[in-house]
Amino acid sequence: MVGIHMAEALQVPYFRSFPMPMTRTRSFPHPFATPNHPKGRLYNDMTYVLFDHAVWRAIASRTNSFRRSTLGLPSTTYEKLEVWKIPYLYSFSPHIVPSPLDWLDWIHCTGYWFLDNPQTGWAPDAALKAFIEAPDSRPIVYIGFGSIIVSDPFEIIRVIVESVLLSNVRAIVSQGWSSRLHDKKQQEGANEATKKEAGAKKEGNQEEDILKKYPDTIFSVQSVPHDWLFPKIRAVVHHGGAGTTAAGLRAGRPTIIKPFFADQFFWGERVEEMGLGRCIKQLTVENLSAALRVVSTDENMLRVANQVGHKIRQETGVETAIQCIYRDLELAKARTMSSIQKTAKTNYVTSTSKKDGEDDQDWTLIEDAMSGSISPGSWKPAD
């Protein structure tokens, strides 16, 4: 939400962008409010209103303080910002989330924005290549949950190892979640008790020991580029972050998502709805091993994933986004100028008729003349 205020101060065009759908629709709920089962179009619609309402009330005071003290702008309200009229660029694939029919013309689903062939200097070590190329008929899966911080990393390792052994697969395990917790404990310094430091070290050693116990079945890495690895293996298991989900689907790999929070549940359910994989809410040996058996043996799922991957690889997300920017540039300029004019017009009234900070709480629902739908803005709580 900071960009819109900076654009107003600089008097430049402004576009919004996000890797998950945030624009109001009746087609599906807000990604942060995904229910356990469908609740209907009205529920879907209201999740966006309530989310925007909650966010604005949480940030309004600091936002207006930033506007006044840093940008030299007067306070504003969600109604005056009219964020629903600003051009939006969504960096996900329309093959995964098609644009809803109730989205307006300036809301674009461009396709994923991939950075191909980045000059990182990374190269796989010989041990990793040997593991992938080993003459072993068992399919290889990738398992990694990003930088998620968990309370018991050893338990996650235990579940992964037991599930892999039960599923007749081999696994490349990326330990980002546990190493981050271990590093944090190591950095606590001399002020922490030696006993705690020794415990953290022991925990880290336990994780390494159990992963190294089955060298022909499990290979542990700290990190590996997804665009290099995923096309070489059978399936991927991850937390459902937008970027990792995109990488797995682009490679045409069946996907298991274990969501932890936020939009990860949305992507997990979308993958399962499309027949591209499984979403498991609880990380248990029973759940993970069952899902691993499906993604490693279901040839129809692999076929569907390959078809979707082919479509995604044909997309030109970055190029499409650039074209959308040029197409809607004048509209973006007009939106910024309209915001400036509204601020200038109401500045005197606001400063003389409202108490300081009252704008922060303004929340309304008005009939949006441009869309013919109810928009966040002019419903005010009863005094």
Where are these regions (language model features)?
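A donor-sugar binding/catalytic signature common to diverse glycosyltransferases
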Residues: 222-269
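Short internal beta-strands
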Residues: 170-176
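C-terminal amphipathic helix plus adjacent low-complexity
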Residues: 285-383
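Short beta->alpha connector loops at strand-helix junctions that form conserved
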Residues: 17-18, 240, 257-261, 279-283
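Active-site donor-binding acidic/aromatic loop of nucleotide-activated sugar
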Residues: 214-223
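Short, well-ordered beta-strand core segments
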Residues: 14, 88-89, 236-237, 255, ...
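Nucleotide-sugar-dependent glycosyltransferase catalytic domains
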Residues: 1-170, 182-204, 210-213, 303, ...
